[in-house]
Amino acid sequence: MVKANYIRAGRLVRIIRGPRQDRVGVIVDIVDANRVLVENPSDVKMWRHVQSLKNVEPLRLCVPISRNCSSKVLKEAMATAKTLEKYANTKSAIRIAAKKAFAESTDFERYQLRVAKRSRAYWSRKIFDENDKKNPVSWHKVALKKLQKNAKKVDSTPAAKKRIEKARAARKAKPTAAKEKSKK
């Protein structure tokens, strides 16, 4: 599927590289085919500046503004459209926030996270296994259940019962034969 997030005034963009990396702004004006004017009045570091199109990722969200509007108008339009709140709920924003939090975390916090992940995996596996015993859903349990069902059908014939009895008798006879050899 082709991305249709075209560059236009009012389009929300994320800065890819540089000192403003992963910050969000709005295209206020298009300078030329390679550069745009970007601003975010609610972010102190995102004052109105020129950005290369190679350095911005257009997002699907838009703000209804005219080209080269004032900061006041842009701030009001962003507040009424609630674009920053909508962006904060997107998967990419959540991923970036998690990445930033992990990078800023201390050694001990990363250790705690590893321990918590291990614990969560252990308990979820334990609960899954308990439920799998009651009502099999994993492929190996289902396959085992099918094999046992087919074995019951085969074992119910008189010839199969005879073979099973013969095998049981042979198994019982083996230990006694071993004892006799050890006595001699």
Swiss-Prot record:
Listed GO CC annotations: cytosolic large ribosomal subunit
Keyword annotations: Ribonucleoprotein, Ribosomal protein
Similarity-based family: Belongs to the eukaryotic ribosomal protein eL14 family.
Single Gene Ontology MF annotation: RNA binding
Domain of life of the source: Eukaryota
Region ranges (Disordered): 149-184
Keyword check for Ribosomal protein: yes
Name under which the protein is recorded: Large ribosomal subunit protein eL14
Basic residues composition bias: residue spans: 160-174
One BP term from GO: translation
